[in-house]
C-alpha cells in the first residue's frame, strides 16, 4: 500500500509534468515537443511521463483540456445573462475580452494558452477536429447567440459572427514576433488588448445602432 508521502510525491510529479508539458507544447507545438524534453523541463526521470500519462498524445489532450476545456461553457452561457441593452453590450464585451485572453497574451498562463492556440491553429494536429468541436464551436456559438439577439437575417448573422471572430483570431494566426508590429511603441500588451476590445465593441455597437 502506498503511503501518504508517496501519493503526495506522485501528485506533485504529475503536476510538474503537466506544467512542463504546457510550456513545451506552447513553445514547440505538438510535433516539436517530446516526452523526453518535457521530463527534462520538469526535472524528473524520462520514464515518468509514460508512467503517469501513457503517451504524448494523452498528455497533449489533457493540457489542451486544462487550457480550453473550461472556456466554452461560460462563453456559451453569456446570452443567458442578457436582460436589456446594457447587459447585452456587457456580454459581448466579455466575449471579446475573454477571446483576446487566448490570442493576445501578456504573461504567465496567458502566454502558454496563446502559444498552444497558435500552434494548433497554424499547424493543426490530428486532434484538431475534436478540439474544434469540443472547445471552438461552443465559443463561436456563444458569440453567434449574442449577435442573434440583434441580427435576424441568417446570412448577415453569419457575416457578423465570422467577421468578429476573424478580428480576434488574427493574433493567434500571427507569429508572436509580429504582435509588436500591431501594437504602438510603448503600449503594454494588456493595455493594448483592452484598446482592441474597446475598438471592436464600439464599432459593433455603432454599426448596430445604425442598422
Question: Residue locations for each model-derived region?
Answer:
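N-terminal intrinsically disordered/low-complexity leader segments
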Residues: 1-12
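N-terminal hydrophobic signal/anchor transmembrane helix of membrane proteins
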Residues: 88-105, 193-211
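Helix-turn-helix
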Residues: 16, 24-58, 62-66
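An amphipathic alpha-helix adjacent to DNA-recognition modules
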Residues: 11-19, 52-76, 80, 129-133
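Hydrophobic alpha-helical connector segments
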Residues: 76-109, 154, 160-164
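Hydrophobic/aromatic-rich alpha-helical bundle segments in the mid-to-C-terminal region
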Residues: 114, 128-137, 146-200
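Short secondary-structure transition hinges
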Residues: 73-82, 101-141, 185-191
Amino acid at each position: 500500500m502506498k503511503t501518504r508521502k508517496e501519493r503526495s510525491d506522485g501528485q506533485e510529479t504529475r503536476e510538474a509534468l503537466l506544467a512542463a508539458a504546457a510550456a513545451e507544447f506552447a513553445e514547440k507545438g505538438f510535433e516539436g515537443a517530446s516526452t523526453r524534453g518535457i521530463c527534462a523541463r520538469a526535472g524528473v526521470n524520462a520514464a515518468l511521463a509514460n508512467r503517469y500519462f501513457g503517451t504524448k498524445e494523452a498528455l497533449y489532450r489533457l493540457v489542451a483540456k486544462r487550457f480550453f476545456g473550461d472556456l466554452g461553457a461560460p462563453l456559451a452561457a453569456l446570452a443567458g445573462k442578457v436582460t436589456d441593452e446594457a447587459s447585452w453590450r456587457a456580454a459581448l464585451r466579455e466575449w471579446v475580452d475573454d477571446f483576446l485572453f487566448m490570442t493576445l497574451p501578456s504573461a504567465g498562463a496567458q502566454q502558454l494558452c496563446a502559444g498552444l492556440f497558435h500552434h494548433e491553429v497554424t499547424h493543426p494536429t490530428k486532434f484538431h477536429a475534436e478540439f474544434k468541436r469540443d472547445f471552438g464551436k461552443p465559443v463561436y456559438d456563444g458569440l453567434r447567440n449574442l449577435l442573434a439577439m440583434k441580427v435576424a437575417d441568417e446570412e448577415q448573422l453569419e457575416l457578423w459572427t465570422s467577421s468578429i471572430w476573424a478580428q480576434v483570431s488574427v493574433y493567434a494566426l500571427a507569429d508572436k514576433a509580429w504582435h509588436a508590429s500591431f501594437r504602438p511603441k510603448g503600449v503594454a500588451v494588456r493595455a493594448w488588448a483592452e484598446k482592441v476590445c474597446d475598438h471592436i465593441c464600439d464599432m459593433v455597437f455603432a454599426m448596430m445602432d445604425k442598422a
